[in-house]
Regions:
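Basic- and aromatic-enriched surface patches that contact anionic nucleotides/nucleic acids
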Residues: 2, 10-18, 22-23, 126-204
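Short alpha-helix boundary/capping and kink motifs at helix termini
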Residues: 4-36, 40-48, 52-132, 136, ...
Length: 204
């Protein structure tokens, strides 16, 4: 089974709203959607329910706080234990990324309307938390003047500390210090850093 996550915002096979949430997948070339409808719930759509578990597993790699899944008729498909959510101030969060893609900012503005809509993954570090994902959301919170976001605690490998060191060398200690760039510039700068970093560090 070949599962591909769709990372573009324009694809006629999918709902625009779900594309903006990054909840679209191709499974052996067939379209499947996972649409977030609450803090912990989502609807999964696609022709073959036999592959739903695999799609949900892929989806939850990025969004583990979503724990209940329903089909298009409202029947529960899968359920996981609910995760505890923290409320963190932006100043408590150390980014592990340097750049923010302005196209992604525009995309999330379609479905993030209040601070409570932002849920990220973090890793505890001394008195603070390292953000493992959700950097676009964090920067959007800064742009909107919001003080707090919500988070779930996850684990991470030691390489995250090396990326944090690189961020701090660039003066990035909180979300507001990341740099907003065009999509093309983001692809070049951030992807090049990641390629070089993981090649040198031997991380796969």
């Amino acid at each position: 089974m070949d599962i591909q996550r769709i990372n573009t915002y324009n694809d006629n096979q999918f709902s625009k709203a779900v594309l903006l949430q990054h909840g679209c997948f191709l499974v052996d070339g067939k379209p499947y959607e996972v649409e977030i409808i609450s803090d912990y719930e989502a609807i999964i759509r696609g022709e073959n329910q036999a592959v739903y578990a695999a799609v949900i597993g892929e989806f939850r790699f990025y969004t583990p706080h979503i724990t209940q899944f329903y089909d298009k008729d409202g029947k529960k498909v899968m359920e996981y234990p609910r995760l505890s959510l923290l409320t963190l101030r932006l100043e408590q969060i150390q980014p592990s990324q340097f750049y923010v893609d302005e196209d992604k900012i525009n995309a999330i503005s379609a479905f993030i309307h209040k601070p409570q809509d932002i849920i990220i993954q973090v890793f505890p570090d001394k008195e603070r938390y390292i953000s493992l994902d959700g950097h676009t959301r964090l920067y959007y919170a800064f742009l909107k003047g919001w003080d707090c976001v919500r988070a779930i605690v996850e684990t991470s490998d030691d390489w995250i500390y090396k990326i944090v060191d690189e961020a701090q060398k660039r003066g990035i200690y909180t979300p507001k210090e990341m740099t907003l760039v065009s999509h093309d510039e983001y692809e070049i700068k951030w992807n090049r850093f990641c390629d070089d970093f993981f090649a040198c560090d031997g991380v796969e």
